[in-house]
A protein has these predicted regions:
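Conserved N-terminal subdomain of the carbohydrate kinase-like
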Residues: 1-32, 47-50, 213-226
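Short beta-strand segments
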Residues: 6-8, 34, 57, 125
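Short gly/ser/thr-rich secondary-structure transition/capping motifs
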Residues: 11-16, 58-65
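Short, well-ordered coil/turn residues at beta-beta hairpins
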Residues: 34-35, 83
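Short beta->alpha connector loops
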Residues: 35-40, 59-63
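Conserved phosphate/ATP/ADP-binding segment of small-molecule kinases
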Residues: 46-53, 60-143, 149, 178
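Conserved post-catalytic alpha-helical subdomain immediately downstream of the catalytic base
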Residues: 117-120, 145-225
């Protein structure tokens, strides 16, 4: 149930996409490179070298077709947010904990650890099994929120990443604070749990603050975070 199968990838207009954004966007505090091409990711990261926090996602196509570019981007970011299959593909191991450590050390990236280390923090999205955050100062595990009715998981990874990074804005990039990372992951898990209940953005766009807070409080009690 938690394993995605890619039948075909059609890049269409993204095939030759070159990000061109306003000058004031180049001073963004938090930068998230979603699963675009490593070439685009590196371009955005190079233009935002003063960001407090940088993060990226990817998917199988780029691991297979531009591993060098992906490795270059991974050495520039603070946080990588991948699903379990992506972690194991990059880390070249069937154990995601082993793979994550190899990515963070740079061992499994193009050129190896001597070229440079990877991100300081790697978050593994594990579907119904929740998520695991491997941080240089420890490991965080959280279950998924038990959603009674699952409609469509499309976009949950992006919603998860967006909610997680939004919680880091007040921290001004202090990702070394592992408890703040834990709290951000709680918000990310809860937000993604709403997204899975509908197609597209319907559930998120119509979500009321009170309903969100009620589920957040329930999940906090479940995982022992008050």
């Amino acid at each position: 149930m938690d394993n995605a199968e890619t039948v075909s990838t059609e890049l269409n207009s993204l095939a030759d996409f070159n990000p061109d954004f306003p000058l004031d966007w180049k001073n963004s505090e938090i930068v998230f490179c979603s699963s675009a091409s490593p070439k685009s990711q590196n371009s955005v990261l190079d233009a935002n070298q003063g960001a407090f926090v940088t993060a990226l996602d990817t998917f199988a196509l780029w691991i297979e077709e531009d591993f060098h570019g992906l490795s270059e981007a991974l050495r520039k970011v603070d946080i990588a947010i991948f699903n379990e299959d992506e972690v194991n593909r990059i880390g070249d191991d069937s154990n995601y904990m082993v793979s994550a450590k190899k990515i963070m050390s740079g061992e499994s990236l193009d050129g190896g650890g001597l070229v440079g280390s990877g991100p300081d923090c790697l978050i593994v999205k594990r579907g119904s099994a929740g998520c695991v955050c491997i941080h240089r100062d420890g490991v965080i595990t959280l279950p998924a929120y038990p959603v009674p009715k699952i409609v469509d998981p499309t976009g949950c990874g992006d919603v998860f990443a967006g909610a997680f990074l939004a919680q880091l804005v007040p921290l001004k990039g202090r990702i070394a604070d592992i408890e703040s990372i834990r709290r951000a992951l709680v918000h990310a898990t809860v937000t993604a749990s709403f997204n899975i209940e509908s197609f597209g953005t319907d559930a998120i766009s119509n979500l009321k603050r009170g309903k969100y807070r009620a589920r957040l409080d329930k999940f906090r009690r479940m995982v022992g975070i008050i």
